[in-house]
UniProtKB/Swiss-Prot annotation:
InterPro entries: Enolase-like_C_sf, Enolase-like_N, Enolase_C-like, Mandelate_racemase_C, OSB_synthase_MenC1, OSBS_N. Its EC number is 4.2.1.113. This is o-succinylbenzoate synthase. It comes from Escherichia coli O127:H6 (strain E2348/69 / EPEC). Converts 2-succinyl-6-hydroxy-2,4-cyclohexadiene-1-carboxylate (SHCHC) to 2-succinylbenzoate (OSB).
């Protein structure tokens, strides 16, 4: 016997969260809980404003229609990426095919003060990997901050993300302030420039490896080995079903590229599932999941070690 519930939720964000020049005051999304006999599976559907093609209102309509079809015996996945991902997670939990083992080691995220990151990294066991958002301030400032971090922590490897913010000139201004001897410790810089060709040129001219992120979701993208390209960053909420995520990871690994499972600022429930997906598909790579502290609460499932208050499912708005 099948049953299902759908919940709508909204989490207040910290004041300083800006996405694509837009302040994100709340994180809005949906949960689906599928039950069959004694088993149940959960999934999160939370399109990311400014990045997802769909709004959460669009996602809600598609999800409710899919749930009704599933209750009637139809299991075909929806095409909308955020819904396909959430539903496929719920189905995988229901079928017990999503492993429980999780990689909760997140690369800490630096949005502002480099001193905060230095303190975080001092207590980090093992390989020191951190992520720094660049492109929000002047490129020269970004270069100086990155250089400072690499100089202060000799065993640090940095992942940088520019979200296509730079012109070729700004990319050169950034690189000018990063010591040549430190550049090999930049694990990769995600999408430095507005076009892929400009990003490729940046990698050739600076010796700084790049990674594809937004490019993966463009219709003309193909997985090929290219000089200067070291990694792909896979955001499942923006990608689609678990099968599609796995296909992309396998395509990257076949070319010798690093595949990084990365957050789209999901709630704690979604983040714990991403940690399980990372342990399953990319066991040797620290995922990019250090976004929970951008929120003011956890929901339904706790992230280990987080001190944020937990909102129980009973406090959420039930739609079905």
């Amino acid at each position: 016997m099948r049953s299902a519930q759908v919940y709508r939720w909204q989490i207040p964000m910290d004041a300083g969260v800006v996405l694509r020049d837009r302040r994100l005051k709340t994180r809005d999304g949906l949960y689906v809980c599928l039950r069959e006999g004694e088993r149940e599976g959960w999934g999160e559907i939370s399109p990311l404003p400014g990045f997802s093609q769909e709004t959460w209102e669009d996602a809600q309509s598609v999800l409710l229609a899919w749930v009704n079809n599933w209750l009637a015996g139809d299991c075909e996945l929806p095409q909308m990426p955020s819904v396909a991902f959430g539903v496929s997670c719920a189905l995988a939990e229901l079928a017990e095919t999503l492993p429980q083992a999780a990689n909760y080691r997140a690369a800490p995220l630096c949005n502002g003060d480099p001193d905060d990151l230095i303190l975080k990294l001092a207590d980090m066991p093992g390989e020191k990997v951190a992520k720094v958002k660049v492109g929000l301030y002047e490129a020269v400032r970004d270069g100086m901050v990155v250089n400072l971090l690499l100089e202060a922590i000799p065993d640090l490897h940095l992942r940088l993300d520019a979200n296509r913010a730079w012109t070729p000139l700004k990319g050169q201004q950034f690189a000018k302030y990063v010591n040549l001897d430190y550049r090999h410790r930049i694990a990769f810089l995600e999408e430095p420039c507005k076009t892929r060709d400009d990003s490729r040129a940046f990698a050739r001219e600076t010796g700084i490896a790049i990674a594809w992120d937004e490019s993966l979701r463009e219709p003309d993208f193909a997985f090929v080995a290219e000089e200067g390209v070291r990694a792909v960053v896979i955001k499942p909420t923006l990608t689609g079903s678990l099968d599609k995520v796995r296909e992309q990871v396998q395509a990257a690994h076949a070319l010798g590229l690093t595949a990084v499972i990365s957050s789209s600022i999901e709630s704690s429930l979604g983040l714990t599932q991403l940690a399980r997906i990372a342990a399953w598909l990319t066991p040797d790579t620290i995922p990019g999941l250090d976004t929970l502290d951008l929120m003011q609460a956890q929901q339904v499932r706790r992230w280990p070690g987080s001190l944020l208050p937990l909102v129980d499912v009973d406090a959420l708005e039930q739609l079905l």
